[in-house]
Amino acid sequence: AQIGRTEALNEAVEANGWNLLAQQTGEFTQAKGQEVMESMLKQYDNINVVYCENDNEAFGAIDAIEAAGKTVGSDIANGEIMVISFDTTHAGLQDVLDGKIECDVECNPLHGPRAEELIKKLEAGEDIDKLNYVDEEIFAHDDTVKSVKATNSLDEEKDFDVTPLTQDILDKRAY
């Protein structure tokens, strides 16, 4: 997943002409995410967006941003720093509701049960589709962005809906 997330960022930077100030791994931990963000804040005074490859890194980045007296949020024109993350842990989605993470892209933990279901079908002699997917969602703090265009693992470009997160949606999630 990490390789795909990094490649997607690099492709978006190139396609949109964005200025990527720096790129460093947070090693998927809150502590390292905080350490990296503290370093970035000392090196750069014009950070607009922080792209974290999981929620733990985002939590650390948010801690560092707030400790530096800066504000996380979507109003980058007025100095806020937007945080984007992946995984959609319960705590990550709570940060989406609270406006600390602007967008959180799901990495569904239900792949295991889906694989088990497919194995049982095969063992029972049933046919299954060659390709099987577990639904995943993109959650945002508000409804500013309705969908995003991305290329899937089959190299097909498609639109993915962005769901504005509500407390009701968060409360009904199984994980």
Q: How would you name each of these model-derived features?
A:
Residues A12-Q30:
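Short beta-strand elements in bilobed, periplasmic/extracellular small-molecule ligand-binding domains
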Residues L9, G26-Q94, E116:
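Hydrophobic alpha-helical
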Residues Q2-N10:
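Short, surface-exposed alpha-helical segments at coil->helix boundaries
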Residues L20, N46-I47, I101:
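Local beta-strand N-terminus motif with an aromatic residue
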Residues L20-Q23, V83, D104, I138:
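Conserved beta-strand scaffold positions in the cores of enzyme catalytic domains, especially
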Residues E11-V13, C107, H111-Y175:
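Hinge/cleft segment of the Venus flytrap/periplasmic-binding protein
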Residues Q23, D98-P109:
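Short beta-strand elements at the ligand-binding edges of bilobed clamshell
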